[in-house]
A protein has these predicted regions:
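Gly-Asp-aromatic-enriched flexible segments
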Residues: 3-156
């Protein structure tokens, strides 16, 4: 009988690298320590991390080392239900930062969520990146107000 790999829910404090969010360099915030409700598509989350972004083409990322014997990484991504701009699309991307190989991505609008499930058996490190897309005719100077959320991260 094969042994089941242990589950591990990484926290923001355990990240090995963090890229601040956008031109104003907002910091990533732990959902459990936030004063605001963190909800994606009407589902509330308390485990994970989020960051505020104010301009088109803003981006931010968080990286974790993959634990030994981990086979799968799951995480849910989306924009906070309380984001003020409803016409903004955010691309959520999970990659191997060592090889720069994109493992999965999704472009999500407000009220959309995606649960990623990534095979990490041969990946030493994961990078979760969020990039605010510029709508046609917009530029980096276009002001927006959204919060991106990565929720319920779990290695198993």
């Amino acid at each position: 009988m094969a042994s089941k790999s242990p589950e591990w829910n990484p926290t923001l404090d355990q990240a090995v690298a963090k890229e601040r969010c956008g031109a104003r360099s907002y910091s990533w915030e732990t959902l459990s320590e936030s004063d605001d409700v963190s909800a994606i598509a009407q589902k509330t989350y308390t485990n994970g991390f989020k960051c505020h972004m104010e301009y088109s083409l803003d981006a931010g990322s968080v990286e974790f080392l993959v634990p030994k014997d981990a086979k799968t990484f799951t995480i849910t991504a989306g924009q906070s239900d309380y984001s003020r701009d409803t016409n903004v699309t955010v691309t959520f991307e999970i990659s191997d930062p060592i090889s720069d190989k994109v493992l999965d991505s999704a472009s999500l609008r407000l009220n959309e969520a995606k649960e990623f499930s990534i095979d990490v058996s041969s990946v030493p490190r994961l990078k979760m990146k969020a990039l605010v897309e510029a709508a046609p005719g917009e530029s980096r100077k276009s002001n927006i107000s959204i919060t991106v959320i990565w929720a319920d991260p779990k290695f198993s």
